Amino acid sequence: MSKTLNIIWQYLRAFVLIYACLYAGIFIASLLPVTIPGSIIGMLILFVLLALQILPAKWVNPGCYVLIRYMALLFVPIGVGVMQYFDLLRAQFGPVVVSCAISTLVVFLVVSWSSQLVHGERKVVGQKGSEE
């Protein structure tokens, strides 16, 4: 019985912490003058708490495993909601594809540029002919 209560406590604690960060993000988003989704702010709060080791990762792991395991199921309502606008999407298929392609290219270029900026040019160990 004690082991069962311990497992229930771990899952309950994980979900309470994840939802606390989510609702803190929603609250902060309601105070901001710009529109930023509260879920994004909540994820950033959770990330900062984990990165600064204020919140031990083992406290949120059980809840994260459950959410990741059933993530595909959580996208079903979104897919059904998008299908309500199928005619609009079909009419605007060209611009949607072009904007997706352009935004993918822009993201690729920005990530490659920022990676080059952060990491710089590095000498490959064992590379011949690069000793100057």
UniProtKB/Swiss-Prot annotation:
Disulfide bonds: none annotated. It is a multi-pass membrane protein. This is UPF0299 membrane protein YohJ. GO terms for cellular component: plasma membrane. It comes from Escherichia coli O157:H7. Keywords: Cell inner membrane, Cell membrane, Membrane, Transmembrane, Transmembrane helix. Its main location: membrane. Belongs to the UPF0299 family. The lineage of its organism: Bacteria, Pseudomonadati, Pseudomonadota, Gammaproteobacteria, Enterobacterales. The chain crosses the membrane at residues 7-27, 31-51, 63-83, 93-113. It is found in: Cell inner membrane. InterPro entries: LrgA/CidA (IPR005538), Uncharacterised_UPF0299 (IPR022957). Residues 28-30, 84-92 are cytoplasmic. Residues 1-6, 52-62, 114-132 are periplasmic.
